[in-house]
């Protein structure tokens, strides 16, 4: 097993994008453990932007969707986890940009037989658009 792989994903919540510049406001961090998976993707960023004048706030539930892919056997797993403090950001007039993320790792079935030859570069995956 590669030393750089982890069994939990770090989620940063609340990076707020403002028009014309990028600012970071009230970033919170939490971890999600994925039991028998080992991950190459070590972190994702849940970003919010200000609601436009003519936009209405979506009735958006607070879950994040993670699409897991095993780099060895190509097994796929979909996982839903709660988005920390999502309702607070929505109440403050922000809109979440993306809620679906692609995660690369090695599933529990492949962990034992995984070798460095199978390893991909460590990546922080940009959200799917």
Swiss-Prot record:
Suppressor of RNA-mediated gene silencing, also known as post-transcriptional gene silencing (PTGS), a mechanism of plant viral defense that performs sequence-specific inhibition of viral mRNAs expression. It comes from Beet necrotic yellow vein virus (isolate Japan/S) (BNYVV). This is Probable suppressor of RNA silencing. GO terms for biological process: symbiont-mediated suppression of host innate immune response. Keywords: Host-virus interaction, Inhibition of host innate immune response by virus, Suppressor of RNA silencing, Viral immunoevasion.
């Amino acid at each position: 097993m590669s030393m750089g792989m982890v069994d939990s994903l770090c989620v940063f919540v609340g990076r707020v994008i403002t028009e014309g510049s990028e600012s970071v406001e009230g970033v919170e961090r939490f971890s999600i453990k994925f039991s028998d998976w080992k991950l190459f993707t070590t972190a994702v960023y849940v970003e919010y932007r200000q609601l436009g004048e003519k936009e209405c706030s979506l009735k958006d539930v607070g879950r994040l969707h993670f699409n897991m892919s095993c780099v060895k056997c190509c097994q796929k797993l979909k996982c839903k986890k709660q988005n920390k403090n999502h309702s607070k950001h929505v109440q403050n007039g922000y809109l979440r940009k993306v809620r679906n993320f692609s995660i690369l790792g090695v599933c529990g079935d492949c962990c034992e037989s995984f070798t460095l030859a199978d390893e991909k570069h460590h990546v922080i995956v940009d959200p799917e658009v």
